[in-house]
Amino acid sequence: ENKLNYYQPYKFQKSFHQAGSESNQRLLMAANRVGKSYVGAMEMAAHLTGLYPKWWTGKRYNQPIKAWVCGASNETTRDICQKELFGQPDNPRDKGKGSIPKHLIGETTRKPGVPNAHSSVMVKHKSGGWSRVAFKAYEMGAEKFMGESLDLIWLDEEPPQDIYSQCITRTLDRRGQVYLTFTPESGMTEVVQNFTSNLRPGQALITAGWEDAEHLT
C-alpha cells in the first residue's frame, strides 16, 4: 500500500517539512534509525506528485518539477532512496510500495552497470504534467553535478562541500530548494558548520535523537 496517503509525521518530521515554507536550505541532522531517509522520501514524493497532505504547511509546487536525489554511492542511493520512493529495487512487484503511488510512476531509465538502479523516473504531477527525478552519487565527483537547473535536490547522507556548493548553484535560477538528511558521522565538517555555526537567513536546522522517534521509544 502506498505510504503517502497514511503519513503521520512525528513532531520533528513535521517541523522539517514546515521549515521548507521559508528556508531554501534545510538540514535534518539526526541519529541513526529515527527515519531520516523516510522523511526525505515523503518530502520528495509530495513535491513530485503535488499531492500534499491536509496538514502540510511547507513549500508547495503547483507545477511539475525537476529534481535530484543523491547519496554517497550508486548502490546506497538505490538501496535507501530509490527503495523509499519506489519500492524494493530487486522486486518488480514492489513498485508503488514506496512513497510514490504506482499509478503515478511513468517512464523509468535504468542506470548502466548498477543492477536494478534507476537513473531517472518520470512522475505524474496532479497539475497534469510530469515531474522528473534523477539519481546521483557523490562518488561520481562534483563535475557530474554541474550544468542542470533544478527545482529541488535531496541529499541523503552528508555530501562533500564541493558537491553541496554545486547543488546550491543548480537551484538558484529556479529559486529552488536543497534539503539534507544525515547523521553527522564525520564530526564538524564544513557542511555541518554551515548549519550549526553559521546559520543564515534561508537556512534551517532540525535535529532529532532516538527519543524523538516514537517507534524507538
Residue ranges and their predicted role:
Residues 1-217:
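Phosphate/NTP-binding elements of NTP-utilizing enzymes
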